[in-house]
């Protein structure tokens, strides 16, 4: 096992702790559920659910979380295939226990619409 493994595990534990705070706040503030991933770098990524939401619902979920997190670097780009990609970065904590992450959403056009 690499010497850097203890660091990676600590970073993941820090992200796990922050995720626990996020889930508690989501219950309290009625924020929508996201699919969360903790990377080996300790980055925490929340993806808006595309299977159980409408395009408007996905955008609303993205905006709810980015607003609550005071996220920055928010981007809203439409790809050639008509998919809108939303992305924003956030930070939680300070110093050695700071956790960085992102909120993402890929909003596909409704099936009855052709991409332009």
Where is each model-derived feature located?
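Structured alpha/beta or helical-core interaction and ligand-binding surfaces enriched in interleaved
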Residues: 1-116
